[in-house]
Amino acid sequence: MYKNLKENYPLYEVRTTESFRALLDEGAELFGDKAAFRFKVKGGEIKSVSYREFRDEVDAFGTGLYELGLGKAHIAVIGENCYGWARAYFTVLATEGVVIPIDKDLSDEETQYILDFSDAEAVICTKNSEAKLDRLLPSLPKLKTVICLGTPAEGEGRYAADALAEKGRELLAGGYPESTPAAVVY
């Protein structure tokens, strides 16, 4: 009645990886230009992002986060399911930070509790979740930075995710300035 799985089906080769960062690099190397994500953009057009492009976008966005001083921060991600949410989540995983995914449908009280208890210093949100965060910010003194996956509301500590990624791309393309110390040897 049942087949013996050990005899009839060989086990698949499994790769081990050292870190999430290494997993992104290996995916880009192994699958290169194959589609990692496909999603609809405004107008109904389907956009495809390859493994290599995704790794490069994660690198750029992560570099933008480091430029803001958030490379090792606790960062919450809240919003509806979209490519930007996935990019934000994977980016924080690939940095030295801690990601805090928050369900967009939680009440204000539950969201506030998670943001406070997790010591979140920044939140990456979709435009639809920004209004909820605006209501909660006065009661969250540790939360200093809001990064919007759309166009952010005006204000101190507000950034657009795409602008941060673009800044990260510029920094990655430019390399280190000659004035940046690389080593201090005595």
Where are these regions (language model features)?
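N-lobe entry segment of adenylate-forming
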Residues: M1-V49, E53-L68, F90, K142
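Conserved pre-ATP/AMP-binding loop-to-beta segment of ANL
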Residues: G32-A35, C148, G168-Y186
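Conserved AMP-binding/adenylate-forming
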Residues: E45-S48, G62-L106
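A broad, structural micro-motif
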Residues: S48-V49, Y159, Y176, A182
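Structural core segment of the AMP-binding/adenylate-forming
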Residues: A94-A163, L172
